[in-house]
Amino acid sequence: ALWQFRSMIKCTIPGSDPLLDFNNYGCYCGLGGSGTPVDELDRCCETHDNCYRDAKNLDSCKFLVDNPYTNSYSYSCSNTEITCNSKNNACEAFICNCDRNAAICFSKAPYNKEHKNLDTKKYC
């Protein structure tokens, strides 16, 4: 679920404010996405978007009311390390790994302030 993804980012980047820092960044961070990612961090978001799209197509994730944004899973955080719980069902495990991989990707990618609130109509 999206609120868990925010918590995961705070795990890999302590002191960050995921909603303020990463929402509306580049062409893919935030709602929707199009065009070519502007940098490594934006590529993390594109990959995460694609991962959620793939989750919706999984047999184990036949969403009715649930979707990757609201479907919750179980995970733990220890010293910036995220572990998805082995007790998650197949769908929860998939979404947890989407979020885990993106949070790790975010933590390794440089942050370019000029890509925050980018004019997506012009650059994406």
Curated annotation (Swiss-Prot):
Gene Ontology cellular component list: extracellular region
Catalysed reaction equations from the record: a 1,2-diacyl-sn-glycero-3-phosphocholine + H2O = a 1-acyl-sn-glycero-3-phosphocholine + a fatty acid + H(+)
GO MF annotation: an example: calcium-dependent phospholipase A2 activity
SUPFAM superfamilies, per database record: Phospholipase A2, PLA2 (SSF48619)
Cofactor comment text: Binds 1 Ca(2+) ion per subunit.
Locations listed in the record: Secreted
Cofactor(s) the protein requires to work: Ca(2+)
Binding annotation for Ca(2+): 28, 30, 32, 49
Enzyme Commission number(s) of this protein: 3.1.1.4
Signal peptide segment: none
Key words, A-Z: Calcium, Disulfide bond, Hydrolase, Lipid degradation, Lipid metabolism, Metal-binding, Secreted
Disulfide bonds: 11-77, 27-124, 29-45, 44-105, 51-98, 61-91, 84-96
GO biological process, one term: arachidonate secretion
Top-rank taxon, per record: Eukaryota
Stated role: PA2 catalyzes the calcium-dependent hydrolysis of the 2-acyl groups in 3-sn-phosphoglycerides.
Similarity comment: Belongs to the phospholipase A2 family.
Note in the entry: This isozyme constitutes about 5% of the pancreatic phospholipase.
Official protein name in the record: Phospholipase A2, minor isoenzyme
Organism from which the protein derives: Sus scrofa
